[in-house]
Amino acid sequence: MEVIQVKKSLNLKGEVKIDGAKNSALPIIAASLLGTEPIILEDVPKLKDVSIILKVLEELGSKVTYLDKNKVEIDSSNVNNSVTPHELMNKMRASFLVMGPLLTRLGQTKTYLPGGCAIGSRPVDLHLKGFKALGAEIESTDEKIEAIAKDGLIGGEIYLDFPSVGATQNIMMAATMAKGETVIENAAKEPEIVDLASFLNKLGAKVRGAGTSTIRIVGVDKLHGARHTIIPDRIEAATFMVASAITRGDVTVKNCISSHIMPIIAKLREVGCEVIENEDEDSIRVIATGRLKGTKIKTLPYPGFPTDVQAQFMALMTVCKGQSSVEETVFENRFMHVEQLQKMGAAIATEGNEASIAGVDSLQGATVKSTDLRAGAALILAGLVADGTTNVTDIYHIDRGYDDIVSKFKKLGANIERIEIED
């Protein structure tokens, strides 16, 4: 089987360029179904999840052309298939984001329930609540969902019980061609929401308030083409910032927007890192010397501490001096990495959605399993400071969210390889 093998690599040093954000690219690619003219997207990350959603679009009738490694042209002018492919939908959760665009453009869609990271229930009921509020009729079974709006969608008011990113995005896209005004209350505020709104407006949509808890969309008759650059991936940036901290390194993260990751910057300073922001160059330098001290984090919807960096920060906490704690409030069942870190000698106790960590002097290399995307990243970070050799298995999870993570770490001086080992 293929593993990522990591050997102790202290004092990482150098620069790393961050790719476009996966969590922005996926909804924007889905939204490309709305345009009746070609769309060009730049800084599209080369990831497994991205290739899956592009295949979904091709199955629906879009023409997808790579102009270079990170530039894609999507022509959805001839899309007329409203049924999503079952085998592709089953591979990735974000594939559900095509439902809103198909519903508003074609008046109907049949889709299969999605797969992806097994983090808690992550239900799609908020998406469906939004579609119903816009006048769609929904029929669902355990496997598939059908939505129909015979006479088109009609603007409405939607209150989200939780500021779900996916639901906010799906409802925004569905509302772009609904008759009248749609108001989403308690909307997600993530930078990826703002990026999607920016893209939709380039297509000719009328979206206001993205980045606040109230988003207003006035429906238009049709949307056209556009050129758009995906924002940098704040989670990838945070991962390499934590890598600098855990290895007592000096790493400059390029192509990142510091205002998108303020909680990470604040917490790294709290544990004892020097963090230098250079907004003119969109870069952040993280310098760590000596042993860092423990801290507390509580995951929250944006602009709070991101749940997608919880596992990586916990890896850092395992070797900080003193006690640390984590409270996970966004997703249930998001401590699957704890057992793997414990195999490496981490002193972690969990109760419900809380974890307490007693910092240890050193971790030990082990064979550990990447249980989800961010857990995989956390185990690589732990391997960088563990004595001996760490083999991270199930690395397909890591490939879903990081493009060429091994070569990026190598450039910083890490002893890391993708290799085949016997099962």
UniProtKB/Swiss-Prot annotation:
Function: Cell wall formation. Adds enolpyruvyl to UDP-N-acetylglucosamine.
Enzyme's top EC category: transferase
Catalytic center residues: 117
A GO term for molecular function: UDP-N-acetylglucosamine 1-carboxyvinyltransferase activity
Subcellular localization: Cytoplasm
Species of origin: Finegoldia magna (strain ATCC 29328 / DSM 20472 / WAL 2508)
Catalytic reactions of this protein: phosphoenolpyruvate + UDP-N-acetyl-alpha-D-glucosamine = UDP-N-acetyl-3-O-(1-carboxyvinyl)-alpha-D-glucosamine + phosphate
Annotated keywords: Cell cycle, Cell division, Cell shape, Cell wall biogenesis/degradation, Cytoplasm, Peptidoglycan synthesis, Pyruvate, Transferase
Protein name, UniProt field: UDP-N-acetylglucosamine 1-carboxyvinyltransferase
Residues carrying 2-(S-cysteinyl)pyruvic acid O-phosphothioketal: 117
Tagged with keyword Isomerase: no
Lineage, uppermost ranks: Bacteria, Bacillati, Bacillota, Tissierellia, Tissierellales
Alphabetized Pfam families for the sequence: EPSP_synthase
One Gene Ontology CC term in the entry: cytoplasm
Main location: cytoplasm
Family that this chain belongs to: Belongs to the EPSP synthase family. MurA subfamily.
Chain residues that bind UDP-N-acetyl-alpha-D-glucosamine: 93, 122-126, 308, 330
Signal peptide location: none
Tree of life domain: Bacteria
Pathway(s) it belongs to: Cell wall biogenesis; peptidoglycan biosynthesis
Swiss-Prot/TrEMBL GO biological process terms: cell division; cell wall organization; peptidoglycan biosynthetic process; regulation of cell shape; UDP-N-acetylgalactosamine biosynthetic process
